[in-house]
């Protein structure tokens, strides 16, 4: 089943979103042991005193929807954790760095669940769901950073940020340094490499139109990288 069958966060009404949030919070303690499975979802429901009908109402398509909602929840938690006035006072590059970092800080208590989600989405049949989830996160970060581009710049910056999100998340998952200090250094270097507007524009203009998208980072590439790292360990 692909992510095309999953409703996006913008399609959910408040009641369904709240019920999904409640079930997600209940299922998360079980995910490190059971993975993103029906077993973890059902265990969380039992903890909350919910029925199978409640689970079917919230996640009719099962664990895949639960993983997709985890990504949506993380994006909303990221935005809620950032002070809008403080963010507005930063340069655009600093805003992007701050938002990516806050997202990982929000996810830190659930690091093993993130690892399990990456493994789940690395399965080929689930890869489209992972690609769409990362793309949505990139959209939200650029929007929160105040980016209003609607031309080709929008596509290039979005794709480059997807690359930053993927590589930084992989680094973070394997980072054992105190308070993930090495990850924040890695993130700063990645942002410096690919999110300078001048360098982005230069790359886009130097590539013939039909080859632009192929030259940019993609969610699928992130999935392939995760799968190759799993095989290497």
Where are these regions (language model features)?
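Short, amphipathic alpha-helix enriched in basic
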Residues: 7-53, 61-68, 72
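Hydrophobic alpha-helical connector segments
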Residues: 17, 21, 81-116
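Hydrophobic core segments within long, regular secondary-structure runs in both alpha-
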Residues: 24, 97-104, 135-142, 184-191
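Acidic/His metal-coordination segments adjacent to aromatic residues that form catalytic metal sites
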Residues: 85-89, 143-148
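Internal, conserved structured core segments that host functional sites
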Residues: 102-137
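Amphipathic alpha-helical packing segments from all-alpha helical-bundle domains
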Residues: 125-147, 155-162, 166
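Hydrophobic/aromatic-rich alpha-helical bundle segments in the mid-to-C-terminal region
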Residues: 147-209
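Long, charge-rich low-complexity segments
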Residues: 200-233
């Amino acid at each position: 089943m692909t992510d095309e069958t999953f409703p996006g966060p913008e399609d959910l009404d408040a009641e369904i979103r709240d019920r999904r949030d409640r079930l997600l919070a209940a299922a998360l303690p079980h995910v490190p042991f059971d993975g993103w499975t029906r077993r973890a979802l059902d265990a969380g429901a039992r903890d909350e005193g919910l029925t199978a009908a409640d689970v079917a109402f919230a996640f009719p398509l099962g664990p895949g929807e639960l993983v997709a909602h985890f990504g949506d929840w993380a994006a909303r938690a990221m935005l809620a954790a950032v002070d809008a006035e403080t963010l507005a006072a930063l340069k655009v590059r600093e805003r992007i760095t701050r938002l990516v970092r806050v997202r990982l800080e929000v996810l830190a208590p659930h690091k093993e669940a993130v690892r399990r989600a990456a493994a789940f989405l690395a399965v080929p049949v689930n890869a489209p769901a992972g690609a769409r989830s990362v793309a949505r996160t990139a959209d939200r970060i650029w929007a929160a950073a105040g980016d209003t581009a609607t031309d080709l710049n929008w596509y290039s910056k979005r794709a480059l940020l997807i690359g930053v999100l993927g590589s930084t998340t992989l680094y973070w998952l394997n980072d054992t340094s105190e308070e993930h200090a090495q990850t924040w250094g890695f993130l700063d270097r990645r942002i410096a490499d690919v999110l300078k507007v001048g360098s982005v524009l230069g790359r886009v203009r130097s590539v013939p139109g039909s080859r632009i998208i192929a030259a940019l980072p993609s969610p699928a590439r992130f999935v392939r990288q995760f799968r190759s790292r799993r095989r290497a360990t």
